Amino acid sequence: MQKHYTVAWFLYSAPGVDPSPPCRSLGWKRKREWSDESEEEPEKELAPEPEETWVVETLCGLKMKLKQQRVSPILLEHHKDFNSQLAPGVDPSPPHRSFCWKRKMEWWDKSEESEEEPRKVLAPEPEEIWVAEMLCGLKMKLKRRRVSLVLPEHHEAFNRLLEDPVIKRFLAWDKDLRVSDKYLLAMVIAYFSRAGFPSWQYQRLHFFLALYLANDMEEDDEDSKQNIFHFLYGKNRSRIPLLRKRRFQLYRSMNPRARKNRSHIPLVRKRRFQLRRCMNPRARKNRSQIVLFQKRRFHFFCSMSCRAWVSPEELEEIQAYDPEHWVWARDRARLS
């Protein structure tokens, strides 16, 4: 074993013989050159990561909305190093990528130009209209202003119904303006617009339905409001209150004490006769008509999405459509 090692050492130590194996000579030289170059070049510090920046997007009063803006990690030093390593007259990009590279460079130039220009604030979307209602010291009360839905066709339907003979007699009868002053009639037009029916569909019944509902909202005089049935269904409806009165008297007289006391029997018979007399076919018919009227009034109220209150601003806007109309002269302030 010692002889073999001595011969091997002698062969490798002979002059003119490369001690390294032939297969590793080229790789060894490259590795040594790369290690020498790496030792000569100074170690470069890593570029710090770009930090996030925030820019002002919108400014409204004392509130400010911030928007995050990303900063590109590519610096001018990277472009200089890239251009210095390029050989003169040699296109660094492959032939099949030259057109895309040009587009990319053009887009980069445009993006740099756009960054230099000031950023434009986006126009806000249209919001609801708010008007100043009251200003007291440093406090201001804002009120949202609704756009009126009354159209000219609703005014035309209202004017057409004013030509109805029954409505004419009703307005002429109400001289004290307890049921049909200018504000209540303006509410009728507002209800026509909220109900959503076509203008040709409004009839005499719809006029009295809207007027009855307006009196429910603004007035507390039930006796004057009941006169609407007199003009809508005729004079026979006058027996309906009497019917209710006689029925109440009959029930009151038929109490347990009255049943035991025979002296009240003639009175009970009298009340029963009065009840039958006032419950004639016409009275029963008018009573059913009033029940149907109340049912239709509820359906009309539901068709307006249960919005029966009308603001004074909307009433003034309705009257301003035709200020010379004779209906708007029905003002209670002029009577006093």
UniProtKB/Swiss-Prot annotation:
Keyword Protease applies: no
Record keywords, A-Z: Williams-Beuren syndrome
UniProt feature, compositional bias: Acidic residues: 36-50
Protein's UniProt keywords contain Transmembrane: no
Tissue specificity of this protein: Predominantly expressed in testis and heart.
A UniProt-annotated Pfam family: Spy1
Example of a GO MF term: protein kinase binding
Disease entry from the Swiss-Prot or TrEMBL record: SPDYE1 is located in the Williams-Beuren syndrome (WBS) critical region. WBS results from a hemizygous deletion of several genes on chromosome 7q11.23, thought to arise as a consequence of unequal crossing over between highly homologous low-copy repeat sequences flanking the deleted region.
Protein name: Speedy protein E1
Lineage summary: Eukaryota, Metazoa, Chordata, Craniata, Vertebrata
